[in-house]
Amino acid sequence: KYNKLANTNKIVILNTPNTKGNRDDYSFGDEENIMMNSLLKYSDLMVTMFSTMQIEAALFDLPVVNYALREIADADYKSTRLDPQGVMKMPHVSRILQTGGVKAATTFEELYSHINDYLDNPALDSKGRKIIEENFVGDFMGNGSEKTADYIHSLLYT
């Protein structure tokens, strides 16, 4: 259904990542990393279903609309825990939503409205995206291993 959407709408670009490995242990090649960075830098908007990529999007101040539409859910969400709207209640997702830096749509009407709002005003919710950057990214600057070791050391010797 996503391919059909992309094939029938010129403005929709569907990117399917080229990964190496299996579902539990995969990585992106250099070309895929370049493509992903280009998408983040040059896109007008990201539409996703609560992907962690919304954190990277915040680094580029890229507006994000998440969708949780039961009408297009592949699973029987009434008898399983795969309710697309249930994802919004997961702690790691709700913390992102609480920043006000992204939008979530539970109906097609909301989806269209949020998309149009961001296309009309890309700066909308920019302050919230800055909060995502500050709260979820951190200052690693190439010394993440050292900071991790220092933290473990502090736990052991305090």
Feature map (PLM): residue ranges:
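Context-gated lysine
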Residues: K1-K4, K10, K20, K41, ...
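A structural signal for well-ordered alpha-helical segments within the folded catalytic domains
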Residues: I34, E109, G142-E146
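C-terminal alpha-helical cap of glycosyltransferases
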Residues: M141-T158
